[in-house]
Amino acid sequence: MLERLKDSLVNSPVIKRGEYNYFIHPISDGVPSIDPRLIEEIANYIIRIADMDVDTILTIEAMGIPVANALSLKTGIPLTIVRKRPYFLEGEVELSQSTGYSKGVLYINGLKKGDRVVIVDDVISTGGTLLALVKALQNMGVEITDVISVIGRGAGYFKLRELGVEPKILVTIDVSEKGVEIQDVFGDQ
C-alpha cells in the first residue's frame, strides 16, 4: 500500500533549518520533479478511503494542488483552491492562518452554506492552516465530509479533533538528522 509514497519519503533528503529537520519531497515541495505515478497512486488511494460524495474538492494553495487536481480529473468533481491573495469577489471569506514557520492570510471563494467538501492537503504538521480553514468552513455552514493529508508530521492533527474532525493521514512520518522514518500508514493494520 502506497509503496511509491513510502519509498520516496524514506529516500527524501533532510536539511537543517535552525533547529528544525526539514524533509524535501515532491509532494510537499515540488522538488525534485513530481512523478505522475506517485500522484496517481495517492489519488487512487484517496478515492478508496475518502467520502467523495461532495460538491467540490477543496485544497490550499500551493502544494495541495497537484494531488487535488488528479482527484478532480479521476472523479469529475470540481476543484476549489483556497488562495493566498484576495480576488474581492462577493462572498469571499478571509482567514488568518499560522503554521510553525509562517503566518499569512488565505481567501475562500466559490463556496456557500450547504456545500459539501472534501479537504485535501499535502502535509499536516502544526495543524495551523487546516485548523483555520476548518473553523472558517464551519462558520460558513459548509459541510466537511473528510480531511485528507498525504503526509503527517507531528501532532498538529489533534487540534482538528477539537473541532469534531478526524483527519485521514496517508503516511505519518518522523524526521531526524538521520532521515525520514515511516511511523504509520492509514489503513495498514
Curated annotation (Swiss-Prot):
Biotechnological utility: Used for negative selection when transforming this organism.
Keyword Ubl conjugation applies: no
Free-text disruption phenotype from the record: Cells have increased resistant to purine analogs 8-aza-2,6-diaminopurine (8-ADP) and 2-methylpurine (2MP). No change in growth rate in HS (minimal) broth.
Enzymatic reactions: IMP + diphosphate = hypoxanthine + 5-phospho-alpha-D-ribose 1-diphosphate; GMP + diphosphate = guanine + 5-phospho-alpha-D-ribose 1-diphosphate
Pathway: Purine metabolism; IMP biosynthesis via salvage pathway; IMP from hypoxanthine: step 1/1
Any one Gene Ontology molecular-function term assigned to this protein's record: hypoxanthine phosphoribosyltransferase activity
Enzyme nomenclature, EC number: 2.4.2.8
SUPFAM superfamilies cross-referenced by the UniProt entry: PRTase-like
Localisation per UniProt entry: Cytoplasm
Superkingdom of the organism of origin: Archaea
Primary site of residence: cytoplasm
GO cellular component: cytoplasm
Keywords: Cytoplasm, Glycosyltransferase, Purine salvage, Transferase
UniProt GO BP: IMP salvage; purine ribonucleoside salvage
PANTHER family xref list: HYPOXANTHINE/GUANINE PHOSPHORIBOSYLTRANSFERASE, XANTHINE PHOSPHORIBOSYLTRANSFERASE
Family membership: Belongs to the purine/pyrimidine phosphoribosyltransferase family. Archaeal HPRT subfamily.
Quaternary structure note: Homodimer.
Role, per record: Catalyzes a salvage reaction resulting in the formation of IMP that is energically less costly than de novo synthesis.
Record's protein name: Hypoxanthine/guanine phosphoribosyltransferase
Encoding gene per record: hpt
